[in-house]
UniProtKB/Swiss-Prot annotation:
InterPro entries: KsgA/Erm, rRNA_Ade_diMease-like_C, rRNA_Ade_Mease_Trfase_CS, rRNA_Ade_methylase_Trfase_N, rRNA_adenine_dimethylase, SAM-dependent_MTases_sf
Domain of life, per lineage: Bacteria
One function term, GO molecular function aspect: RNA binding
Function: Specifically dimethylates two adjacent adenosines (A1518 and A1519) in the loop of a conserved hairpin near the 3'-end of 16S rRNA in the 30S particle. May play a critical role in biogenesis of 30S subunits.
Family named by the database record: Belongs to the class I-like SAM-binding methyltransferase superfamily. rRNA adenine N(6)-methyltransferase family. RsmA subfamily.
Methyltransferase listed as a keyword: yes
Top-level EC class: transferase
Key words, A-Z: Cytoplasm, Methyltransferase, RNA-binding, rRNA processing, S-adenosyl-L-methionine, Transferase
Subcellular location per the Swiss-Prot or TrEMBL entry: Cytoplasm
Name of protein: Ribosomal RNA small subunit methyltransferase A
PANTHER family: DIMETHYLADENOSINE TRANSFERASE, DIMETHYLADENOSINE TRANSFERASE-RELATED
The keyword rRNA processing is annotated on this UniProt entry: yes
Length: 255
């Protein structure tokens, strides 16, 4: 029976074989990898990944799709977690000593940002991540200071990862086609992020970008004096989108 994509799960299934093979080439699965796919859907990518790995895990919320997966794959090779990826504890996936998780997925666009922040908590235990996301989101993730789209997502994720937009995917590659272009992003956790308390950095960045049109002195009024900004090399008249990650970290370390 044909599965009808569900809007509430943000389901857009990747059906273009050329795009699928390009994604697999970018991931380059190896037999001993501990691979976990978020939202396998109709398993188009799952099947190709299983050609390269001995065993993999999938996290799927849609119970109908979970049943399809159970009927289609050997349970010794495909371990299915019927769960919401936003709530799932990825540390429960067993990984051989000396290895790390490889995480992949065509992420539901309606939960992409909170899911990326949830996964960031697992960064020390992850080798890499390859995700299909809305192109606009990927552009925000990799944006540099001075860009119109540089913001909270850019700073918080660049503190944790080296990221690269691999290639753009047109709406026609999906069923049903989304209204926007998509892109593949590669995320490699940094071995040594700049020393900083994550909660404090989040606090600073959230306040800084809550009023983008104001200068940083006004955005952070009540949290930092102008002298604090000057001491970490920030011109108080700059706008928040022009300030690099290292200076946000320096501010967080003053809290």
């Amino acid at each position: 029976m044909k599965h009808i994509p569900r809007k509430r799960f943000g389901q857009n299934f990747l059906t273009d074989d050329t795009v699928l093979y390009n994604i697999i080439r970018a991931i380059d699965p190896q037999p001993q990898d501990t691979m976990v796919e978020i939202g396998p859907g109709l398993a188009a990518m799952t099947r190709l990944l299983l050609e390269g790995v001995q065993q993999m895990h999938v996290v799927e919320l849609d119970r109908d799709l979970v049943e399809r997966l159970k009927k289609s794959f050997d349970p010794k090779r495909l371990i299915i977690h019927s769960a919401d990826a936003l709530q799932f504890d990825f540390s429960t996936i067993p990984v051989p000593a000396g290895s790390k998780l490889r995480v992949v997925g065509n992420l539901p666009y309606n939960i992409s940002s909170p899911l990326l922040f949830h996964l960031a908590e697992m960064a020390p235990h992850v080798q890499d991540q390859h995700f299909m996301l809305q192109k606009e989101v990927v552009e925000r993730m990799v944006a540099e200071p001075g860009s119109k789209v540089y913001g909270r997502l850019s700073v918080m994720l660049q503190w944790r990862y080296h990221m690269e937009l691999m290639f753009v995917v047109p709406p026609t590659a999906f069923d049903p086609p989304p209204r926007v272009e998509s892109a593949i992003v590669r995320m490699i956790p940094l071995a040594q992020p700049l020393p900083c308390d994550q909660a404090k950095l989040e606090q600073v960045v959230l306040k800084a970008f809550s009023q983008r049109r104001k200068v940083i002195r006004n955005c952070l009024a009540g949290m930092f004096a102008e002298s604090d900004l000057l001491e970490v090399g920030i011109d108080p008249q700059l706008r928040p989108e022009t300030i690099p990650l290292a200076q946000y970290v320096a501010l967080a370390n003053r809290l």
